[in-house]
Each structure stands twice: as structure tokens, then as C-alpha cells.
Amino acid sequence: MALALVSVAPLVSMRRSLFSSPYELKSIDKTIPNLVMCRKRMSGTPSIRVSSTTSASNDDGVRRRVGDYRYNHWDDDLIDSLATSYEAPSYLERADTLVEAIKDRFNSMGVDDGERMSPLTDLYQRLWMVDSVERLGIDRHFQNEIKSALDYVFSYWKEKGIGRGRQSAVTDLNSTALGLRTLRLHGYPVSSDVLENFKDHNGQFTCSGIQTEGEIRGVLNLFRASLIAFPGEKVMEEAEIFSTMYLKHALQKIAVSSLSQEIEYLLEYGWHTNPPRLEARMYMEVFPQDTIYEQKLVELAKVEFNIFHSLQKRELQSLTRWWKHYGFPQLSFTRHIHVEYYTFGSCIATDPKQSAFRLCFAKMSYFVTVLDDIYDTYGTMEELELFTAAIKRWDPSVVDCLPEYMKGVYMAVYDTVNEMAKEAEKVQGRDTLNYVRQAWELYIDAYMPEAKWISSGYLPTFQEYLDNSKISFGTRITILQPILTLGEPLPHEILQEIDFPAKFNDLISVILRLKGDTRCYKADRARGEEASSVSCYMKDNAGITEEDAVHCINDMVNNLLKELNWELLKPDSNVPISCRKAAFDICRIFHHGYKYRDGYGDATIEVKNLVKRTVLEPVPL
């Protein structure tokens, strides 16, 4: 066969022995003779199995499959023209002044002078302050104050929960639910059993039925707490069912207000599909401003949002230059969604110091999309094998072996991965490139079985499909290098606790693979890609309907999300919480894109709204 001209020994196998040698690459066969000769083989090569409705002939005469995608939704001139005045020193100075004022408020919460903090409300007020700065996206300024406030609340935590204040005689649903959620998210050992105290003698959650604003807010916080459930917590499942029904009923009765808008938002996005920056923007719009401290909280949130918007402009322009430099606009067969991926990154990493994370995440996510379109749709089998070999060789000289449309892609991957490894070395104090290359080999190898399934029309079993596709989905690629730039040293043995095949990474990969399939399988099938978790599940369970298969897979996802909650918050993890949270938020932001439909094949209304509200449009002051 002509392909014998390329001989590359794989760096690693696909077994778990991947990590047996942390930084030492396996041997590579250095002899790849006459690479330029491979270009002679490009014409007349059989392509991947073609769907009659999505095929096209390229200039090279090869009949190829193409996706029915719309292309760049965001005019480059618009991006270049984004203007902002929020980098002016006056805004930075105002932000600093507001931060100090809010710190003073935190530090004065122990003062009982009738004006500030009553022993009948001090617990709830502390929780409310912590929850407010977190939801407004300004909590990075108050980490010490948050810890002090939560230590205080936890010192009064009881088996039946807490009241509004340390001297409250009766436990309170609002305070207990908000406390359960907030303390759990910060690693305090609190049990969901406290919610049993709010059931009636029949074991059912109950409320007065009057639906006052206070009661509604209590049930809203019960709903928010129920989403931070761990596996086996039946009371949390019951709380979610009860609170969801209650809040939907309340929406039918209460007038349109800040409270109703908040309820609608949270019922729609919950927690696992709720991007932090989008929630911050919503919360600014509905946040109460009855007191001077509430006004200062909102003002700081808005000023910080717009200062960050100035930074987003520069980063997005930098990303667009990178995108153009490697010729991605000329690739007509792939999705042009680099702006969307930058938006995703900036929705979950809002600290201005995390620029490397945001740009690395956007670039790695875009690579995954382009390679998915090449391997699943556009490339011929021979071209795919050549590209796979080139990635393993990791040498820019092999670019001459590749067809024209692959050359820029290969050099972009090569240059960018190397560049990001240098960024990571500044944080990690060691060269992580070899480790990252191993991840890329495993990832790129996983594409080949799927390409062969498409070519042959083979439909694998559900488990066979999942074992391979959770790697080919590319989650590891989008997580690994970004978290290495976060500022937290990750020794190899700790990195293994969050990187594939550790359970944390495995869960994220499976969740996104399954959820993505429930949104994409029909469009994929129309392009000739039959294998999906839906079709494979139906194959394994003869007689089941497509609708039932989707329902079963969604149930799997919901159960896996509870496991992911535990992996994020379990007390014995050695991985820094900032890295766990970043990986978890990557899952959340991709899950957001699949909320109602495939947000990646063609940018949906929801994804476009996310770009506008979190990147393109500043908040009115």
C-alpha cells in the first residue's frame, strides 16, 4: 500500500498504562522517507461513505461529505471596531473604592448596633452577602471575608439546620437551604438530611400555600440547593421535584417582577447549564437596591463587568488574528465558531489574570471542532491516516505530506500546543509538552475507528461507542492545557487525579458525549454518521423507540451529574479547587450549548444571546 511510505510508531497505547512514564515519550520511528511523494496519492482516492444529501466535489476531484453549516456569525469588522472606555483610570479607582467599602461591610457584620446585624438575622445576612458577591461575579475580591463569614455560620450549624440568626429559636427554610448550598460548595461537611426537618408527618415537603415573597424565596433557595445533590441523596431529589412544581405554580400567580425574572432564569438554566458570567449579568438586572450596600454591590458588579469587557475586546481581536493567520476562514467545510468558544472561556474564567486560560481554551476547543469536521465529514481515509501520522511525528517538516486544506490546520495545532506548553511551564516549573503530546495522540487515534465506522456503515454497541467517543469528543484536549495555565502547580501525580482517565475527566467526557448526541444525532445521521449513543442504545435494546432511548440517556446524564458534583466537592481530593472548578465549569458551558439543541453545528439563539450579553455588549451603568 502507498501508506507504507509513512511509518510512525505510536507514542502510547490506548491502555491505562499511558501514565506509567510521566514525561518520557515512547520511541518514535524517525524514518519517514519521501514524504512529499504522498501528495501523488491524493487524487482518485476513495472518500468516506457519502450521504447523498451532503456531498460535494472539491477542486481535487474527490467526492467529499460536507456539513450543512452556516459560517462566521460575527462580522470581523464588528469585532475590530468594538470600543470601550472602561479602561480609564477613573473606573479602576472607583472599583477599588467600592471593594474597600464592601469589605468594611463584611467586617462589620459582627457588630450588633441595631443598624447592622441583629442576632436574629446575622446568619442569613452573612449567607446572603456571600451568595450575592458570588452571583454578581465579584467574589474574587472577598475570599478572606467569605471564609470568615462561612466559618461563623458553620459554627452554628445544627442537625436540623439554622434559623435566620444565632439566637433564632426556630429553623428557617430559606436560611437552611441557602446555608446547605453555600457551605457545601465551599467544602464544609453539611448533610442534606437537614431538609428532612421541613417535611410534614407524611414525609412531604410542605409550605403554607399563601406564597408570600419570603416563602417563595425560601423555596427558590431550596431549588438551588437541590441541584448540588450527591449520588443517593433521595431528599435532594424530592426537594428538586417539590420546589420545581411550587415555583412554576408561583409564576402563574405573582406579578412580573425582579423575583419572577430570577425564578424564570433559574428554572431554565439551573446550575449545570448556568454560565457564571451570564448569571452575573442577569442578577445585576434583578438585584435589590434598597440600601446603600446593595447599591454598592450592584455598582461594583457593573463596573467590574465593563472593565473585563475591555479586556475581552483585546483578547477576542487577538484570537481573530490567530484564526486568520492559519487560514481558518478559507476552510469552507468547517464551522467558524471561534468567537463562540472565546465567549465560553470568558464566561467561566472571569479573573483578568486568566487570559492564558481563556485563549488556550478557545483555541483548543476550535481545534476539536475543525478536526471533528475533518475526520467525521470531509477527509478521505487516506488523508486521515496521514494527518494522524503527522500528529504523532510532531514535526513541521511533515506538512508537505498533507493535502493543502490540512497544512494550516496542522501548523496551527503544532505551533499553538507548543506555545501553550511554554505558557504552562511558567506556572508548572516543568516542561509539560510531552505529556500533552500523549494526550493528543490518544485523542487523534480515537477518531480513526469512528471514521471507519462511517466508511463501512458499521454500528457499534453502546459500550463500544462510548468507550471510544468519550475520547474522540475532545474534552481532555479542551481541559488539559488550559488548567495548566491557571496558576496552580499540578505535580504529575495530582494532575492524574483530574486528567483522563481519572473519574473526574471521564465523567465530564461521558456527560457531554451523551448530551451532545441527544441534540445532534438526527443531523449527524443525515450526514451519513449513523453511530451515536442514541442509535447504539437502540441497537442494544431491541424494540425501544427513539424517544425512549433519548429519555433513558437523559436519565443517565442526570445521574452522572450527581457523581460529578461529588467529584468536584469531595473532601479528600488533592487537586486544587480552582482547577476542579475550571474543569467543572467547562462541562457547564458546553452543557449550556446543548441546552435545547445543537449549539455548535449552527449557533442557536441561546448561544448568540450568550455572545451578545457576555462579550459584545457592556452593562449600562
Swiss-Prot record:
GO molecular function: magnesium ion binding; terpene synthase activity
This protein's record includes keyword Plastid: yes
UniProt-annotated location(s): Plastid, Chloroplast
GO biological process per UniProt: diterpenoid biosynthetic process; green leaf volatile biosynthetic process; terpenoid biosynthetic process
Keywords: Chloroplast, Lyase, Magnesium, Metal-binding, Plastid, Transit peptide
Entry EC no(s): 4.2.3.52
Keyword set includes Chloroplast: yes
Gene Ontology cellular-component terms listed: chloroplast
Gene3D superfamilies: Farnesyl Diphosphate Synthase (1.10.600.10), Terpene synthase, N-terminal domain (1.50.10.130)
Named cofactor requirement(s): Mg(2+); Mn(2+)
Textual note on the cofactor: Binds 3 Mg(2+) or Mn(2+) ions per subunit.
UniProt-annotated binding residues for Mg(2+) 3: D524
Motif (DDXXD motif): 372-376
Principal EC category: lyase
Binding-site residues for Mg(2+) 2, renumbered to this chain: D372, D376
SUPFAM superfamilies attached to this UniProt entry: Terpenoid cyclases/Protein prenyltransferases (SSF48239), Terpenoid synthases (SSF48576)
Pathways per UniProt: Terpene metabolism; oleoresin biosynthesis; Secondary metabolite biosynthesis; terpenoid biosynthesis
Coiled coil: none
The organelle targeting sequence, given as a residue range: 1-49
Binding-site positions, Mg(2+) 1: D372, D376
Catalytic activity field: (2E)-geranyl diphosphate = (-)-beta-phellandrene + diphosphate
Family according to the record: Belongs to the terpene synthase family. Tpsd subfamily.
Domain notes: The Asp-Asp-Xaa-Xaa-Asp/Glu (DDXXD/E) motif is important for the catalytic activity, presumably through binding to Mg(2+).
Role: Monoterpene synthase (TPS) involved in the biosynthesis of monoterpene natural products included in conifer oleoresin secretions and volatile emissions; these compounds contribute to biotic and abiotic stress defense against herbivores and pathogens. Catalyzes the conversion of (2E)-geranyl diphosphate (GPP) to (-)-beta-phellandrene and, to a lower extent, to (-)-alpha-phellandrene.
Name this protein carries in UniProt: (-)-beta-phellandrene synthase 1, chloroplastic
